[in-house]
Amino acid sequence: MSIASVASVFKGEHAVGSKVTVRGWVRTRRDSKAGISFLAVYDGSCFNPIQGVVPNSLENYDNEVLKLTAGCSVVMTGDVVESPGAGQAFELQVTELEVTGWVDDPDTYPMAAKRHSIEHLRELAHLRPRTNIIGAVARVRNCLSQAIHRFYHEEGFIWVSTPLITASDCEGAGEMFRVSTLDMENLPRTSEGKVDYDKDFFGKEAFLTVSGQLNGETYACALSKIYTFGPTFRAENSNTSRHLAEFWMVEPEVAFATLSDIAGLAEAMLKYAFNAVLTERMDDLQFFAQHVDKTVIERLQSFVSSDFAQVDYTDAVDILQKCGKTFEFPVSWGIDLSSEHERYLAEEHFKAPVVVKNYPKDIKAFYMRLNEDGKTVAAMDVLAPGIGEIIGGSQREERLDVLDMRLAEMDLNKEDYWWYRDLRRYGTVPHAGFGLGFERLVSYVTGVSNIRDVIPFPRAPRTANF
């Protein structure tokens, strides 16, 4: 006898007639007049539960099996048999069943068989992994994460763990969470009346990071090809379906690389990850296609078979101005393209993923390489049909004098970036990288439109439960 996951049984890894033990939770129980109960038991290893056929000859049939309800945890031992019913190839003829955990009050169990709205499930984030939709999201999220790590490993990249606590504002936007151990009721003050951060834990102001990029660049300028994959934080007071205060970012950084190089890297990475989901998690994708967004499978298949289009920002603006479509936000050179503009380009004009590049410098960060025209920077966004921007990246400014000029233009103190400037003083090289918002990727793959439903415990304005 062996411990078996539900997924391993369905994959045929246990011969018909072999005895296995499956451990999981009851989804439903159905009793027949013939004295047999049918238990649907799931363990999270795949989308479908396994059916346990439980005869009334079991010693605990009357006093336990017939009292099982949704959510009870069980250990079932039995023989693997071919299932005569439709929908699954194998089931379990149960010879022994142990109840390891009861649901105290089945009438008040929040995850009972009735269907809940996705909004209601957010209030029950500690129990929502037990539902079909959130369980499927979790498996797809894991598949994407593993695929991304695998992709970079196969491409010879080194994973770098960048710090979550920082003194630098990567984006220069100022929307950062402060990290402090000072007594909020009795703050130390300087002679000018300002908060004296010399008395704080780090002896200076410290924040939660908005990006691992700047730290990642230091390792790329020594190890050539690196990537970071970790949580980032934005204190942006946005209560929308597209924003989180805490989210995960994938940020590769490549020495001796140009904007064109990382555009190619972005395309290869996305196609690799999407192929992994199509190969490994089709059961979950079929659920999303049936209940969330009927286009998810077709969209991913189309994505991996499409060549990425490329267009300069200036040309993209021209396309938008001449398309004859009325946008909510008017288009003019110098604006940051909104979601409606991005989606028009990807879905209606190019009908494919598209890389928009060479943006106006005034709407981009200080570290992006200034182009020869003095007006634009070597920046790019990857736009995907169905969602818009999914990746943002750039070639970094490797020239110290130009970097200092950009810091001054954005009213940033270059002394705060002394270590970042050192990279340009000691063996500077052209280098480039991008950032992928991981939750936005999961949203795109699953069709689950609210980003708060694709991360286990969402953090947003006024939302920090669990």
UniProtKB/Swiss-Prot annotation:
Main localization (coarse): cytoplasm
Keyword Cytoplasm among UniProt keywords: yes
Keyword Hydrolase: no
Keywords from the UniProt entry: Aminoacyl-tRNA synthetase, ATP-binding, Cytoplasm, Ligase, Nucleotide-binding, Protein biosynthesis
Reactions it catalyzes: tRNA(Asn) + L-asparagine + ATP = L-asparaginyl-tRNA(Asn) + AMP + diphosphate + H(+)
Molecular function GO labels: asparagine-tRNA ligase activity; ATP binding; nucleic acid binding
EC number annotated for this UniProt entry: 6.1.1.22
Annotated localization: Cytoplasm
Any one Gene Ontology BP term: asparaginyl-tRNA aminoacylation
GO terms under cellular component: cytoplasm
Pfam families: tRNA-synt_2, tRNA_anti-codon
Highest taxon listed in the record's lineage: Bacteria
Stored PANTHER family: ASPARAGINE--TRNA LIGASE, MITOCHONDRIAL-RELATED (PTHR22594:SF34), ASPARTYL/LYSYL-TRNA SYNTHETASE (PTHR22594)
Family affiliation: Belongs to the class-II aminoacyl-tRNA synthetase family.
Subunit field text: Homodimer.
Protein name: Asparagine--tRNA ligase
Origin species: Shewanella sp. (strain W3-18-1)
Gene name, Swiss-Prot/TrEMBL: asnS
